[in-house]
Design a protein with these regions (language model features):
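"…together with the soluble PPM/PP2C metallo-phosphatase catalytic core" -> "…together
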Residues: 2-158
Length: 158
């Protein structure tokens, strides 16, 4: 489904998604505490003072889905993004309860990026950096797109 974009719809999508998040985040926090899906401080990578619930991504994903279902029309790109997002949320949920090894997380990121690039049609054919225009030939353009998407997924996950 393709999102129908105009000023009114964009405002409504943002408002509804935000309101859903405001409602769902506290609920998922309580569920996370109940199932002990907590992020405990370790002094190495996690410097928070007290344990934090880890299931907030589910609330954000569900909020996104509500906005999408209310205002979207069918498109291969959006379907590929939804499939990839669902896969990432699913593995993130499992990781919140029982840690998933980094190599399996990276494999998941690859599958998600591959889905969006190959199935969804998101491909970087050229990039301009500091006035330099780089053009990527096939199949290098797909490889660069997948690497870029994996890097982006990892930046967001930090």
């Amino acid at each position: 489904m393709e999102l129908v974009v105009n000023g009114h719809n964009v405002f409504l999508v943002i408002l509804i998604t935000f309101l859903c998040s405001v409602i769902l985040v506290p609920v998922t926090m309580k569920v996370a505490i109940h199932v002990r899906a907590m992020d405990y401080p370790d002094g190495v990578r996690k410097f928070q003072k007290k344990p934090m619930p880890r299931l907030g991504g589910i609330a954000i994903f569900l909020s996104f889905m509500v906005g999408y279902m209310l205002f979207a029309r069918e498109s291969t790109m959006m379907l590929s993004i939804l499939m990839a997002s669902f896969l990432l949320v699913l593995v993130g949920f499992v990781d919140s309860i029982n840690p998933v090894k980094a190599k399996y997380q990276l494999l998941t990121h690859f599958i998600a990026a591959f889905t969006v690039s190959v199935y969804g049609g998101l491909v970087l054919n050229n990039v301009s950096i500091l006035g330099l225009n780089l053009t990527f030939p096939y199949p290098l353009n797909y490889l660069i797109t997948i690497i870029f998407l994996i890097a982006f997924i990892n930046m967001v996950n930090l």
